[in-house]
């Protein structure tokens, strides 16, 4: 069973967000998603300054099994990307909720966070797959 931290919020498309002290949100993919994808070989991230829209694809995770679009859980401006993933995409596998984060976004509509799932809701999504 996948680890689903209770302090995070989740999208049904298997992304997570964590609120940071500056009001931004860190975005990554869940442990469940990286388990399904397998060993990461390449991650394509948005650019700092890009505007992302909730529910739209904004990054790509490529593994030995497949390439998968990564969707923005909330809308806003990308303020940072995890450049470590360029040389070490395997961080997504080894630390999905830590060093394997994808990007940070400053939300344009924080109410979108309320539409995301809590850990229990995300577990229900996994159980239905």
Swiss-Prot record:
The lineage of its organism: Bacteria, Pseudomonadati, Pseudomonadota, Gammaproteobacteria, Alteromonadales. Keywords: Lipoyl. This is Glycine cleavage system H protein. Transmembrane segments: none annotated. GO terms for biological process: glycine decarboxylation via glycine cleavage system. Binds 1 lipoyl cofactor covalently. It comes from Shewanella baltica (strain OS155 / ATCC BAA-1091). The glycine cleavage system is composed of four proteins: P, T, L and H. Belongs to the GcvH family. SUPFAM superfamilies: Single hybrid motif (SSF51230). GO terms for cellular component: cytosol; glycine cleavage complex. HAMAP family: GcvH. Residues 24-106 form the Lipoyl-binding domain. The gene is gcvH. Its cofactor is (R)-lipoate. The glycine cleavage system catalyzes the degradation of glycine. The H protein shuttles the methylamine group of glycine from the P protein to the T protein. The modification N6-lipoyllysine is found at residue 65. It comes from the Bacteria.
């Amino acid at each position: 069973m996948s680890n689903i931290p209770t302090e995070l919020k989740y999208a049904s498309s298997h992304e997570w967000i964590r609120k940071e002290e500056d009001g931004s949100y860190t975005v990554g993919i869940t442990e469940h998603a990286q388990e399904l994808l397998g060993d990461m070989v390449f991650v394509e991230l948005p650019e700092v300054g890009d505007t992302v829209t909730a529910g739209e694809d904004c990054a790509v995770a490529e593994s030995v099994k497949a390439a998968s679009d990564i969707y923005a859980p909330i809308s806003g401006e990308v303020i940072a990307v995890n450049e470590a993933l360029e040389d070490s995409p395997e961080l997504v596998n080894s630390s999905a909720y830590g060093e394997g984060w994808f990007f940070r976004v400053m939300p344009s509509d924080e109410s979108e966070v309320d539409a995301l799932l809590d850990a229990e809701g995300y577990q229900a999504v996994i159980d239905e797959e």
